[in-house]
Amino acid sequence: MALNAQQIDFRSAIRQRDYRLMVSIPNKPAPKEGHPVVYLIDGNLHFGIAVDTMRIQACWPDTRDAVIVGIGYPTDRVADALTLRMDDLTTPLQESLANTPWYRKMPPPPNGYGKMDDYLRMLDEEIKPRVAEVVSVDVGDQTLMGHSLGGLTTLHALFRRTASFQHFVAIAPSIWFNNREVLDHEASFVERVRAGEVRARALISVGELESTLRYPSVGADKLPASKDDFQQMVDYCRMVPNTQELGSRLAAEQRPGFTVQTVVHMGDDHNMVPPAGIARGIRFALRSE
């Protein structure tokens, strides 16, 4: 556990399962409005990186120190956390994806798919109040950050639960899931932006090498079984083009109250990009204007 951190285990009434919160609190008195908060999806994987990054960046006067809340599961095994997250960070599986040749050969997650909306409701209704019980928080300075399916969930929240956060950091978001279903909500979101109803800042990033991945020579048991299937997966996911295209469309809608940045992290692939994405995301969300 990182310095100045505490662990909160609880059972969600909404999701009817157990969760673990990892909460890192700044080692300084809270300002009168409370500390900013970064809610980090996949806390089992990325909490330590985020806390260390926050500690370093907060040394500079132009970056606000913040509470880091890693949302995870009561396990110390990364493999378990990766399995448990699948239903939390997805919408119900559509036939268009289920029948895709490369995806059909993937082992199905034991808990299925489709609980993303419940997960985000749990975050608002169960996690935020628990955090507020242990530290003074600024309800007007809150960030949602996630990688991969966590990035997809972050985009879903941006489009559908915009008022829940002020900053959204989507790192290598899995826009491809369910034939890019998340983009079905883009048009209505843009309408609200144009009407002046949205106040949000979004950072969308991706690793430069995510669309040119090569089939690994070892440790590919959780990937498509052949090089051909793997290449079909890479082509289907379009990680870099999907991110850049969405970023460009949203950037064209920028106006007072709504800001978007898109970043390509040079030399990084999907598994390498979280540290760079988290560092850039903390800087984006917490840099003093």
Regions found by a protein language model. Name each.
Residues 1-289:
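Non-catalytic cap/lid and distal C-terminal segments of serine-dependent acyl enzymes
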